[in-house]
From Swiss-Prot:
The active site is at C176. Belongs to the IMPDH/GMPR family. GuaC type 2 subfamily. Its EC number is 1.7.1.7. The lineage of its organism: Bacteria, Bacillati, Bacillota, Bacilli, Lactobacillales. It catalyses: IMP + NH4(+) + NADP(+) = GMP + NADPH + 2 H(+). This is GMP reductase.
Amino acid sequence: MLNEFPIFDYEDIQLIPNKCVIKSRAEADTSVTLGNHTFKLPVVPANMQTILDENVAEQLAKGGYFYIMHRFDEVGRIPFIKRMHDQGLIASISVGVKDYEYDFVSQLKADAPEYITIDIAHGHADSVISMIQHIKKELPDTFVIAGNVGTPEAVRELENAGADATKVGIGPGKVCITKVKTGFGTGGWQLAALRWCAKVARKPIIADGGIRTHGDIAKSIRFGASMIMIGSLFAGHIESPGKTIEVDGEQFKEYYGSASQYQKGAYKNVEGKRILLPAKGHLQDTLTEMEQDLQSAISYAGGRQVADLKHVDYVIVKNSIWNGDASH
């Protein structure tokens, strides 16, 4: 039963340091392996239209970072796979669960992507299980990520259907309003939900949503994530596809949720919103800073690599690091 577990979120947790065993933080190894490939960091930008486009995906792949291309340019997906493979880069795309997606998956046999993410808001669904089975039948060598889910039962079912990884998080993101519109989700207790799901997972979990600081990456790993999907921290860069808007002489970039009216083009079943973020510098600068902060975290853990973060102790401090200020 969930009620037997403590309920907490990122701002409620502080990790407890161990004796440092490396001479320099630069010695800490931040790389992770997912499927048959190793990546520089255990993070992946959210597969959203205001976070990445084909150019950003290419930049990430060339830099040795994991990426998942969004599914909102359906006709562009096969040319995108070719573009990446022609350069010797991995292809990682998203699909939905509508009927026509089955034919699309079958068309990929000639040039199969290395990764496919089944990307729907409520991933604990018969439709997702059917799509996992279809992809595994048609493209047995493709690594399948399925989500999003928020319970151990969902993780077990998707893994049993053939998913190679599950994506955990229902509505904790900055531009997601699922919890407000429906009353459901992991918003406000995403880290506890991750821990709950990780206890039954036999395959990797991708924690998705609710990351507000770089320290939250280390906390996600401590509670069972192999990879962390991040939206708002990756939005608003010079390379980001979101529109640049000037307000009172300041530059902002738009960032909206995948189920917002701005993405859907119509106000129907809306569970996302649009916000403006102050324009940031280059994406690579953020990736470098994340790497350095994660190296510091590994050194505080008394470790040498990412997996060492899984074994540290922690305390539940109930918002005290932000003095209850959820905006931070």
